[in-house]
């Protein structure tokens, strides 16, 4: 009972504190410190741990350069193997030829082609006759995927029976040409052999230029909308396909916004623009120009900085701006085309356009600066000699290294082909022109076709929204001819993508059995359901954040580009080749892609915690956007004589200086130059962005050969120490099963220690390692499947041996733990192992005893109605050791016991009459944790900690001068960031806290009320806390809804149009039934505002920097306060502007050895209404101690933006011999779709008009 606990606490302190003055905050804090340190010492067994480790390991100061090189070579070897597998697939495909069978759709023929459909999960199909009858034939399946959880795919259900084939929604899956190519690409034997060679080989892929994707092993398809089976994916839009299929591109999209581009035409134009943007990768650069009577470039600088890198951040930003423009006036091609060429080619010099009337009225010398004149139908173009020379020389140097220049014209027609303009700017045909004629009724084909055909391009007619996806890919096919023609130049050249979220790994929606009503017998069923769901969620966590990079090769047969063979590599696997266990606990590895964007970094937060969708800028973050400066001061050299000259000082040129220095740091890392390593004073933030820790990092970098990646290492000051085994060679024969016999240990769920067989999903990671440990003990050597991660396995075995007697040590403290309401102790190690000890407190239940089955009878059986239970701090909430929040906090505050309180776990009182520590009649208690990093001199051994019922804190504070009471004497414990760990106000409710409505606990102290606000200001002023400003460059903001609608004049008629389309749809369906069902396969999916996959999610938010002030404890600082009085002379403070009677004294003292600060706020006897907000309101916003993230409104600078060049663009295939009409076999190649081609896809267009509109 709690009464017994109170008596025990009382007895302990009577002897310890006889001379203890409870009216002195200094003495209270000192005695509390001694108690907390003693408790932690008894629970952690720190001395025993150090003695155990000293027998096995020793401290080593490592060389960061040498460790980085070792990691670099491991990663290179790992990537090389994956690259070879993709290359084997390429060679195998190129050795095959496409058969010319004509009976591929005849089930009775030997040539009938089946394939395993990713969407159906089997090889069954439905065939429609290509005639007016539309007769359909259903072909039954002969094989289906038997999907089982795969241990090597993070428990994703897969099948090795066959590869799966995905076909985009707009394509008919029984098209004969498509089927022949699907059959040609069946290289499952190669995929299977590759998979058998390497257990951790991820998905092997092939994307055909025809649109289908083959992947192995098979897995169920991830739908964009599961309920409606919405599928927006097309592998031809992926970065790995685009990179291999085309040269890198500078693209200018010209969007006709003339008065005729109204209603449906503009909607089609917008979708066409999105589809083009979808096909641009980070190796490409782009801008969008709208033109009518005026021309506008949609970037914030109106084109003055040329082209933007084709990141999702930039693409969505410009796409949003399209919605602010309206159709109006005439399309002024004579204004738009010269500007397009000028921006695209970065032309130097200047030009001017004059109407012929203006030209005739000008004096002879008015245009002396413009020596060149070109007469156009409506204008005269006058240009300077420099401008003409720039054209003749191929443009400026603003092409950012991309290989080809491309103009994409989206229009409903052009009055002229403007041959003079193209002859002037593009005489050598170096700029490709692709034209997209939009609208059902568009008839002006000739002019736009001539523009494309005369400039190495292609013209397509995009009749409606259903027409877009497939038509866009004609430009990719056109540009891929160059790759096919120059296949000998590519050799074994591989292409690597940046980071992206692989959809094949994403968790599928949970499918439950047919729902049944809850009965009195459902109790056990529901609890078992909830338990299994918890396990499923733990296993799928890694997959939900699965980001990959992909290596790809173009597949070329007879100089014809056929597609791209690829293998993707999960970044979590690459990260284990540069393992955090090999360096200091505060230091970290990071990786940059070929564009200098961050791939892996502990500060990268790619998932929006609200939407669970990846952020727009998740794969285009700059390193220095994550390495957030402490005070924007930067040191770019460790050379002492240079530092003083390089540190920026406040003044007019401060911002410019900081920018230059940060660019110097970035350049050093990109260039992998370790001759003069760089330093930055940064703030390291926790994942939830509620805490930041200052540290000084030194940066090192190594280039990853072949992949063009950069591996970096940030070593925190004083953190270049680690532990190593004393014996050079580990003796596996000394492994004892007793080390793991108690079963109370866990391994990092996302790290591989020893490889498993695909089918080993019935066992846990811990059970699997026990099997391998037994083999080690029996054979005296490491099993083959453990050799790949031998270094980590040896570290794990050392940690197991050193901590093997911890359970016995914890047993000796059973009574002490029980008396102090401690029910869990743990020790986490850098190897990813966590050893823990459970103790069940007698007065508490770990499953909600007040839950009743009868309250849920009548509902459908669901885990939502299951009995609530305790969330174990280790096994349920924190299994990732060094990657867990508490671990990262502990190692950043050396020699400090960290105290925290959790709102995601609780335990229940057994007695209904038991009161909380605050005296309230509630049936549960919160839980708190204490943890601390354990060191062997300067090297981290791990983090030790324990969990306790929060009642113990309330009872303990009552014996240290802070009993639960009213607000006359307000006593608090603040943590290292001024969050409230304890408050003695007696109306604090555990139940309210656990549902997010609590008072004081875990809240920022300075935001509680006016008294706390003033006290916080005094704490900062007296150096108890240091103020920092943190900028979150990964934040997102909600986009304001656009009130300006495009093509607004047709909006009143939208419902009429919708009625007509619904009527048309009904007639199509009726015709389908009459004709035997030929059109039945057409999708019946509701209208969706998003057109393409990338723009389907996250359209209502945009990236924006946000800033917040943080306050960090100065307990070890040079200016640590010596007085406990926050006001000189211990005078009273009157913080209320509207209440002169409020008078308080404020004191503070560090609780040494912990992260806590004790604060007392005592009201004078005559003081009144200090906490009445109507008489003592807060300063909002607070000028002295602001807190909370707010958007940073930066003025968009349009000068000297950094020109980022991709390392991937070093390879360019020449287009000089690329003729748009004649192939290498002297066949005529059209530069536009023929009318017959248009007629052949009419049924598809009709169906997909319904798909996109309703």
Swiss-Prot record:
One biological-process term from Gene Ontology? egg-laying behavior
List the molecular function annotations (GO) for this entry: voltage-gated calcium channel activity
Give the transmembrane ranges: 1234-1254
Per the UniProt topology annotation, the Extracellular ranges are 20-1233
- Which residues does the record list as glycosylated? 100, 140, 146, 302, 365, 520, 558, 757, 838, 903, 923, 1130
Has keyword Transmembrane helix?
A: yes
Principal localisation: membrane
Query: What is the official name of this protein in its record?
Result: Voltage-dependent calcium channel unc-36
Taxonomic source organism: Caenorhabditis briggsae
> Could you tell me the gene encoding this protein?
unc-36
């Amino acid at each position: 009972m709690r009464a017994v606990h109170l008596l025990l606490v009382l007895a302990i302190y009577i002897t310890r504190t006889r001379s203890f003055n409870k009216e002195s905050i200094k003495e209270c804090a000192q005695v509390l410190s001694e108690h907390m340190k003693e408790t932690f010492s008894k629970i952690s067994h720190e001395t025993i741990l150090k003695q155990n480790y000293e027998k096995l390991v020793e401290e080593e100061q490592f060389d960061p350069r040498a460790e980085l090189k070792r990691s670099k070579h491991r990663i290179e070897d790992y990537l090389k193997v994956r690259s070879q597998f993709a290359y084997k697939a390429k060679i195998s495909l190129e050795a095959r030829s496409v058969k010319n069978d004509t009976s591929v759709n005849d089930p009775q023929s030997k040539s009938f082609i089946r394939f395993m459909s990713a969407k159906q999960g089997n090889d069954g199909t439905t065939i429609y006759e290509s005639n007016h009858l539309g007769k359909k034939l259903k072909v039954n399946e002969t094989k289906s995927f038997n999907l089982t959880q795969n241990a090597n795919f993070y428990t994703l259900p897969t099948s090795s029976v066959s590869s799966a084939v995905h076909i985009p929604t707009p394509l008919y899956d029984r098209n004969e040409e498509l089927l022949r190519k699907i059959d040609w690409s069946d290289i499952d034997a190669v995929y299977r052999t590759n998979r058998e060679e390497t257990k951790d080989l991820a998905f092997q892929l092939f994307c055909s230029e025809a649109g289908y994707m083959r992947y192995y092993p098979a897995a169920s398809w991830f739908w964009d909308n599961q309920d409606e089976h919405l599928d927006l994916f097309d592998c031809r839009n992926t970065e790995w396909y685009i990179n291999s299929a085309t040269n890198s591109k500078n693209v200018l999209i010209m969007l006709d916004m003339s008065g005729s581009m109204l209603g449906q035409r503009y909607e089609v134009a917008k979708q066409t623009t999105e589809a083009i943007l979808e096909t641009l990768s980070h190796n490409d650069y782009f801008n969008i120009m709208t033109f009518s009577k005026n021309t506008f470039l949609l970037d914030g600088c109106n084109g003055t900085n040329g082209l933007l890198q084709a990141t999702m951040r930039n693409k969505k930003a410009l796409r949003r701006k399209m919605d602010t423009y309206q159709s109006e006036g005439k399309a002024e091609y004579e204004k738009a085309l010269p500007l397009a060429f000028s921006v695209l080619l970065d032309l130097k010099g200047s030009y001017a356009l004059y109407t012929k009337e203006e030209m005739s009225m000008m004096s002879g010398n008015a245009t002396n600066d413009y020596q060149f004149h070109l007469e156009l139908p409506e204008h005269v173009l006058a240009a300077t000699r420099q401008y003409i020379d720039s054209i003749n020389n191929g443009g400026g140097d603003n092409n950012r290294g991309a290989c080809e220049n491309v103009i994409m014209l989206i229009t409903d027609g052009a009055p002229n082909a403007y041959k003079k303009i193209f002859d002037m700017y593009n005489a050598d045909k170096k700029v490709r022109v692709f034209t997209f004629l939009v609208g059902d009724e568009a008839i002006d084909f000739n002019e736009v076709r001539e523009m494309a055909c005369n400039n190495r391009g292609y013209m397509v007619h995009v009749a409606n929204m259903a027409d877009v996806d497939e038509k866009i890919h004609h430009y990719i096919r056109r540009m891929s001819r160059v790759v096919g023609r120059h296949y000998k130049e590519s050799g074994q050249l591989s292409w690597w993508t940046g980071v992206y979220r692989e959809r094949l790994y994403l968790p599928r929606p949970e499918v439950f059995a047919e729902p049944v009503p809850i009965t009195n017998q459902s109790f056990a069923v529901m609890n078992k359901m909830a338990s299994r769901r918890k396990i499923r969620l733990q296993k799928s966590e890694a997959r939900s954040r699965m980001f990959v990079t992909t290596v790809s090769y173009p597949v070329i047969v007879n100089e014809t580009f056929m597609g791209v063979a690829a293998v993707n590599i999960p970044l979590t696997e690459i990260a284990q080749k540069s393992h955090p266990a090999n360096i200091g606990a505060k230091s970290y590895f990071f990786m940059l892609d070929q564009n200098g964007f961050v791939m892996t970094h502990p500060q990268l937060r790619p998932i929006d915690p609200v939407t669970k969708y990846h952020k727009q800028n998740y794969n285009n973050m700059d390193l220095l956007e994550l390495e957030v400066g402490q005070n924007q001061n930067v040191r770019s050299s460790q050379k002492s004589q240079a530092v003083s000259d390089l540190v920026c000082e406040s003044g007019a040129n401060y911002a410019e200086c900081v920018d230059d220095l940060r660019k110097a740091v970035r350049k050093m890392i990109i260039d992998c130059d370790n001759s003069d390593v760089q330093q930055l004073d940064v703030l390291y933030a926790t994942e939830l962005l509620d805490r930041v820790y200052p540290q000084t990092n030194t940066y090192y970098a190594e280039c990853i050969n072949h992949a063009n990646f950069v591996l970096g290492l940030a070593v925190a000051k004083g953190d270049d120490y680690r532990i190593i085994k004393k014996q050079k060679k580990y003796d596996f024969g000394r492994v004892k099963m007793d080390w793991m016999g108690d079963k109370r240990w866990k391994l990092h769920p996302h790290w591989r220690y020893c490889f498993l067989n695909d089918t080993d999903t019935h066992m846990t990671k811990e059970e699997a390692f026990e099997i391998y440990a037994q083999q080690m003990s029996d054979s005296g050597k490491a099993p083959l499947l453990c050799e790949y991660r031998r270094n980590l396995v040896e570290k794990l075995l050392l940690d197991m041996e050193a901590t093997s007697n911890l359970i016995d040590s914890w047993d000796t403290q059973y009574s002490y733990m029980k008396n102090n309401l401690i029910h869990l102790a743990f020790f986490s190690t850098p190897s990813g192992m966590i050893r823990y000890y459970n103790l069940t407190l007698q007065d508490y239940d770990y499953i909600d005893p007040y839950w009743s089955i009868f309250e849920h009878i009548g509902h459908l059986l669901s885990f939502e109605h299951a009995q609530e239970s305790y969330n174990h701090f280790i096994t349920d909430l924190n299994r990732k050791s060094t990657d867990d929040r508490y671990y990262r906090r502990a190692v950043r505050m050396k020699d400090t016991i960290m105290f925290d309180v959790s709102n995601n776990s609780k335990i229940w009182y057994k007695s209904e009459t038991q009161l909380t520590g605050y005296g309230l009649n509630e049936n549960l208690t919160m839980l708190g944790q204490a943890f601390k990093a354990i060191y062997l001199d300067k090297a981290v051994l791990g983090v030790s900690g324990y969990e306790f019922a929060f009642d113990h804190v309330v009872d303990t504070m009552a014996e240290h001068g802070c009993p639960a009471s009213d607000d006359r004497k307000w006593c608090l414990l603040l943590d290292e960031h001024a969050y409230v760990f304890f408050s003695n106000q007696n109306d604090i409710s555990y139940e309210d806290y656990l549902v997010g409505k609590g008072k004081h606990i875990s809240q920022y102290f300075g935001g509680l009320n006016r008294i706390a606000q003033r006290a916080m200001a005094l704490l900062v002023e007296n150096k108890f806390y240091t103020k920092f400003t943190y900028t979150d460059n990964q934040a997102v903001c909600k986009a304001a809804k656009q009130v300006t609608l495009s093509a607004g004049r047709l909006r009143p008629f939208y419902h009429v149009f919708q009625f007509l389309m619904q009527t048309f749809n009904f007639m199509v369906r009726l015709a389908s039934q009459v004709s035997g069902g030929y059109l039945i396969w057409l999708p019946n999916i509701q209208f969706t505002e998003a057109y393409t996959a990338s723009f389907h999610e996250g359209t209502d938010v945009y990236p924006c920097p946000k800033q917040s002030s943080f306050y960090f404890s100065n307990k070890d600082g040079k200016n640590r306060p010596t007085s406990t009085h926050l006001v000189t002379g211990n005078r009273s403070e009157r913080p209320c502007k509207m209440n002169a009677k409020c008078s308080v004294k404020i004191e503070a003292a560090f609780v040494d050895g912990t992260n806590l600060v004790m604060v007392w706020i005592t009201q004078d006897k005559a003081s009144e209404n200090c906490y009445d907000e109507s008489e003592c309101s807060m300063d909002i916003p607070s000028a002295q101690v602001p807190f909370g993230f707010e958007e940073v409104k930066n003025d968009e600078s349009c000068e000297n933006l950094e020109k980022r060049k991709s390392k991937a663009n070093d390879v360019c295939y020449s287009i000089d011999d690329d003729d748009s009409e004649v192939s290498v076999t002297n066949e005529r190649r059209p530069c536009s779709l023929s009318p017959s081609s248009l007629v052949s896809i009419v049924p598809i267009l009709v169906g997909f008009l319904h798909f996109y509109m309703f």
